[in-house]
Structure formats: C-alpha cells, structure tokens
C-alpha cells in the first residue's frame, strides 16, 4: 500500500514497499518523475530538482 509522506502544490513524495517516489504536479496532473529510491537519496534528489524540501 502506498503512503504519501509529503505533498504540496508542486510535488508529492510517496512511499511504496520501502521505496520512495517523487511525483511532480503540473496543471493538476501528476507526472511521475522518479523511480523508486532509498530514503537516504530522497533529499539529494529533491535538492537537485530545485525543491527546497527537507524530509
């Protein structure tokens, strides 16, 4: 079962089977922008993508 661990008007971070995914929200559509990654890599991914989010 998936669990949303963070969501705002630009991005949603989802956990699924101990992997994390980042979905970008554009014009009301969710665009899958990451493949399952470890939690340790999540903050680096968000920073590199230009988001000021720290989990």
Model-derived features with residue positions:
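Acidic, low-complexity, intrinsically disordered interaction modules
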Residues: 4-55
